[in-house]
Amino acid sequence: MKIVFWGTPEYSLRSLEVINNSKHEIVGIVTQPDKKRSRGNKLIPSPVKKYAISNNIPVFCPDKIKKNENLLVELKKLNSDLFIVIAYGKILCGETLNIPKYGSWNAHASLLPRWRGAAPIQRAILAGDKSTGVGIMKMEEGLDTGDILIEEKIKIENEENLETLTIKLSDLSAKLLIKAIDILNIKKNNDEVNLQNQLTLNREIKYANMITKSEYFLNLDDTAENIYK
């Protein structure tokens, strides 16, 4: 399968590496523009962009997705079968999602529809959830509302923190994405793929809003367990 990979942070890298080392072909990568991350205001590329450059994969760093005709033209030239999206950082519009032959697919780090949105790992920890997981869903214009192809549940251990859980879910995302791509490669027609509507899963719909600055401060009156997390 010819794939355009969309991702930005370190979290995306494991999936990118696994797909790039598989029988499938990454024909292009889309990531966030370089950002100022040091005192000298030096522009630093994303981890995904660094990987693209070091592996000689065409990379695009658009400032915007909507109404970006130049980007649409370049993406269509790649003649891709799939878009694979994991922690890209922006919402893709319908015109973009419909470019690849067999759709756009996202690896989301929660058991949807619980924790739709930008910070599912953090919200699961803060809410005291006992389990979480990764779902591979077919993307649509809604916020993480697409039908699910496959998912896997994992336990959140008592001693789990953001770093350890992020690593686990990053590895799980890579594993499930390859499995999903192989399924789609065999079917070659999304109408034949067995997808599950999120609303049939009997789970509460919750939204994982971005973590605010105030939430980063420790409350010394809190429990030792919560402070550790």
Model-assigned labels for residue ranges:
Residues M1-K229:
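One-carbon transfer enzymes
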